[in-house]
Amino acid sequence: MSEKMYPIPFKSLMNWVITEYAGCGDVFGVHKQYHATGKSLPIFGERIETPFGPAAGPNGQLAQNIIAAYAAGARFFEVKTVQKMDGADLAACVPRPCILANDEGYNQEWSTELTVPQAMDEYIKAWCALKVLSKVYGFGDPDGFVFNMSVGYDLEGIKGEKVNTYIDGMMDASRTAIFGECKEVLKELFPQETAFIDAISPRVSRSVTVSTLHGCPPDEIERIASYLISEKHLHTFVKCNPTILGYQTARRTLDSMGYDYIVFDEHHFNEDLQWADAVPMFERLQALADSCGL
């Protein structure tokens, strides 16, 4: 298996789906697709038909993987994290395999191994594909799923041109070349759905998750979240690393489950966000979100 990922042109991607589904009823190898029941849950002014979805990880970097996850029943997509370091520079820093789970799981992956512009294109391709596939194949409501951005890992990088352009493009894809390309391809392949395709919303994402590396200080986390809430007006999640549980709790839990041979020290537990700092920080952030109507 190649260590490098190669995005598939959108027309080729859609022809693959159409041919495979017509031939054997599969969608990228998913034999039995989930068909929504009509029920849905509210989130950020949108609806999701199931409360499940792939977290931001290597599995969600390419459009075809997002489509496959949707076919299997996922409806909330936290797409892979982007940051100022990307592409070959990032890939060179990630040990292989980046996730090893023969027994316990070891995770050394980081953010997207594509370039940030490539990542945005993949997510917009997946968004447009799912809008049409959900309707044409009857998988569910075209408005029954949500894309959630993930960004890291410092405010300077997030405000920089590369990541800022990504955020703006995900919030409004109407001026991106890939959004126009996707709509033209879809109208060619599904001419009976032209009016629906023309009406596909360019608002790919209205929410964001703040991903924090080990050691990101609480004040930096709060600055990032505050910026995304007040300046970008995005519904905002903040990921807390498992280290917030404390070293003793983590050690005791693993030991009780038979994983006493796994070795780790207290360094990250001491350097990461502490519970005592997290609680008042989230209270302040919630108050800020309330004041911004989020």
Located regions from the model:
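N-terminal amphipathic alpha-helix/helix-capping segment at the start of soluble metabolic enzymes
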Residues: 33-53
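Active-site entrance/lid segments in N-terminal catalytic domains of soluble metabolic enzymes
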Residues: 2-5, 12-31, 36, 56-58, ...
